[in-house]
Amino acid sequence: MDTQTNTAADSLAEILHALRVIRAPIQQGEYDLHDLVRASLAEAEIPCAHEVPLAPRCRIDLLCPGGIGIEIKRGQPDRKRIVMQLTRYAACGQISSLILVTERTVAVPNRIHGKPISCVCLNRLWGIAL
């Protein structure tokens, strides 16, 4: 594994660690979840840009260094729609990997366009699998 790949993997692991400590109160609005995620990243000293346009009509919720994109969904997202959305993001050159943060579990592929996809389910972090 080369240094650049190792650095990207390390960055992804750091971001996932920062997200997995979030304990979101039930009944948060989507932008409240954005704020919780941004606060957790800031506490871990991980910079991110909010609502970043990747292409026309294609804007990711958060973009971290190294092209790690974070999409945040409240409630139970529709699997087909979220996979289509992640596919659009993964097709963009600025994206190296994607993290989907949801309140409820949704099955997504491990890779799209060869880019790793991770999912962080906030309810699971409480020990609740919905």
Where are these regions (language model features)?
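Structural signal for conserved beta-strand scaffold positions within catalytic alpha/beta enzyme cores
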Residues: H50, E71, L100, C119-C121
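Domain-level recognition of nuclease-like catalytic cores that cleave nucleotide substrates
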Residues: D2, N6, L54-A55, E103-L130
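Acidic-basic catalytic patches of nuclease active cores, encompassing PD-(D/E)XK
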Residues: D2-P53
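Short glycine/proline-enriched coil/turn segments at helix->beta-strand junctions
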Residues: A42-I46, C64-I68, C92-S96, G114-P116
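Short, well-structured alpha-helical interface segments that form or flank functional binding sites
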Residues: D32, R57, R81-M84
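Conserved catalytic cores of phosphodiester-cleaving nucleases, focusing on short active-site segments
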Residues: L62-Q76, Y89
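Catalytic centers of nucleases
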Residues: P53-P65
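Short, charged, amphipathic alpha-helix that recurs within catalytic cores of restriction-modification
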Residues: G75, K80-I112
